[in-house]
Design a protein with these regions (language model features):
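Feature captures C-terminal
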Residues: 1-132
Length: 132
C-alpha cells in the first residue's frame, strides 16, 4: 500500500510486536532526539495496515504507542509477517520492488487511492517545526 522505490530489494521478515515497536522507536529517535547532534533526520517508516501514535517529546522507548493492525492492538509477544523494501539484515535480497509494483499494477484493472496510514502525533500543537 505504501512504498518508495528507493531501495531495490523486497523482503518478508517475521517480527514480534516488540521488535516492530523497537524499530519505530529507533527511527523516531533519529528524528526527535533532544540532542541535535544525535538527530539523523530522515522520516518515519511508512507502514501499510499499521496505525500508531507518536509523541516526539517523550523519552526514547516511550514515544510510540497505540500500535494497531487492522484496528486490533499489536501484541508484544505475537509474531507478524512484515514486508519491506529496505532490508535491515546483511545479505538479504528479494525481488526488486519495481518488479513487485509492476506485477501488482498489471494484475489490477483499476487502482484506486487508499487512505495513507500516518502516525497520530501527540503533543506537537504549536510547534512550528512539526507540520501536522
Amino acid at each position: 500500500d505504501q512504498t518508495a522505490i528507493t531501495y531495490p530489494f523486497t523482503t518478508v521478515t517475521s517480527m514480534t510486536g516488540e521488535m516492530i515497536k523497537t524499530i519505530l522507536e529507533d527511527v523516531c529517535d533519529n528524528l526527535f532526539n533532544p540532542d541535535p547532534y544525535l538527530q539523523q533526520g530522515g522520516d518515519m517508516v511508512r507502514v501499510g495496515g499499521l496505525t500508531y501514535a507518536c509523541e516526539p517529546s517523550a523519552r526514547m522507548g516511550s514515544r510510540i504507542s497505540d500500535m494497531r493492525l487492522k484496528g486490533q492492538p499489536i501484541g508484544a509477544a505475537k509474531t507478524y509477517r512484515v514486508a519491506g523494501w529496505a532490508p535491515v539484515a546483511e545479505g538479504v535480497k528479494g525481488e526488486p520492488i519495481w518488479d513487485v509494483v509492476e506485477t501488482w499494477l498489471k494484475s489490477r484493472k483499476r487502482v484506486t487511492p487508499r487512505r495513507l496510514n500516518l502516525p497520530r502525533l501527540i503533543g506537537v500543537e504549536g510547534n512550528p517545526g512539526i507540520a501536522v
